[in-house]
Amino acid sequence: MMQPSIKPADEHSAGDIIARIGSLTRMLRDSLRELGLDQAIAEAAEAIPDARDRLYYVVQMTAQAAERALNSVEASQPHQDQMEKSAKALTQRWDDWFADPIDLADARELVTDTRQFLADVPAHTSFTNAQLLEIMMAQDFQDLTGLVIKRMMDVIQEIERQLLMVLLENIPEQESRPKRENQSLLNGPQVDTSKVGVVASQDQVDDLLDSLGF
């Protein structure tokens, strides 16, 4: 099978694209320094780990609240099942008694069982109320996480503001005419500085551009 070959024109076009990207990157770096925005962006970037920690805190608090609520439901369920079962059994016995009155001894036993059921109900309901209160108290995480989320929104807005400043200050004059915005371009890549080949500082960016001849 014949391998596709790259025409000289294609090689020339690719070289032009790389050269333009390098030149634009260098221009952007120099403009950032002149405008003092490089430090502002660095400060915004430092806020990202803080936002990540806050997100983790929100996840933890939400998980803890969910676990507390589920534990309370599981603890209350047997008490509710027992009351339901006893109430249905007593109702059936009383219906049978009204349909066919039983002996006095059996009637006394039915009355005794009914009184015992009524005596047990407050204990079951008190336990259930305590679990319901626990479920309600578990929702207090919303106040804390609400503050955290608000702080995170402030961080995101600051990063957005800094990035928009960079874009507005570095748009070439010939390209400043109104045009349809491509919102997808606002989504920047995620950078993992622990990976090989990923630059992690401004000096490394400058060295990379110098090595490429820009």
UniProtKB/Swiss-Prot annotation:
GO cellular component term of the entry, any: bacterial-type flagellum
UniProt key word Membrane: no
EC nos: 3.1.3.-
Swiss-Prot/TrEMBL keywords: Chemotaxis, Cytoplasm, Flagellar rotation, Hydrolase, Protein phosphatase
Places the protein is found: Cytoplasm
Secretion signal span: none
GO BP terms, alphabetized: archaeal or bacterial-type flagellum-dependent cell motility; chemotaxis; regulation of chemotaxis
Keyword DNA repair found: no
Location (main, coarse): cytoplasm
Molecular-function annotations in GO: phosphoprotein phosphatase activity
Taxonomy, superkingdom: Bacteria
TM regions (residue ranges): none
Sequence similarity: Belongs to the CheZ family.
Record text on subunit structure and interactions: Homodimer.
Function description: Plays an important role in bacterial chemotaxis signal transduction pathway by accelerating the dephosphorylation of phosphorylated CheY (CheY-P).
Protein name as it appears in the record: Protein phosphatase CheZ
Encoding gene per record: cheZ
